[in-house]
């Protein structure tokens, strides 16, 4: 009875959604070179010391626009060089900087691994739950921590933390208390910005951890902030997406998911910013495109299931998965479906594009490599649920359920 009721509820939820809105390439869609066009440059960081390897993948989604697209890199099939056993769920991908892969486990361990060998260089046991990627800038790792276990606890007394570490030694530089925090940090303009379960978006001084501003949304904030062209964009469980001034927290605009029988979908996913647009999925099963300058709805596209995954932006397409088990390539200007890949399991994790190959994992614990242009299946790997992969241009670092794999092409 419960299963039947849930199925009926979901069917009603989908069928009563607002109609999909078809977009136009002539309205708030920028393809020429400029600040609103797609770039693949990682988030800006100060130059590393000459003796240190470079910063390659400094933040969740590769850059602060959260584009999730790396220009070039290894191609499948792959073989494994080494693997690191995390001991608990690896829900979000690592960063890669100074020759170190830094990743968090769901049970609160933050570990910095030698990218060449997989050996741990330092480890921090927080005693808290974690559901976020760290960020790296200026030889500092910034990490988000949730409440202490149980991880599904609720209550006003719970809190979270943002902690800053020396990237090479793991020494704690500062820690700040925020609400329960599963928002991957955004580092830009001397600030570290996160969202939390209290509905707050908080900016902390990157050097000291002192709060600089706070903005309250209407409900929980679980996604990471995205930043482009002087606008910090983030979604909320109240069904809204807001654009804020990144230095002051002042509200620039507020947009909403489409209404259905008196309610709206909520935004868990992290937005991607490209072409003068905001691209983000919602729990009403739709992917939305809003104008980055105006906040106006430019298109919406139904997927048949919750969209917890964040989108990757490749060329002029939006690549995103759905709980329906379908993975979509959507036209970035109009929302039209370019192609669809049907996987045998719900898709909750976010995809990443490396070269012209898109990687996505399913809750059935399989990672798929697809041709980004056509959706053709190129390779599968029997592990992975959420985190997909990152690269340094030579290796593929694939996030399994509890293991991180370093891989190179076969042959």
Regions found by a protein language model. Name each.
Residues 64-65, 109, 147-153, 200, ...:
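Short glycine/acidic-enriched loop and turn motifs that connect beta-strands
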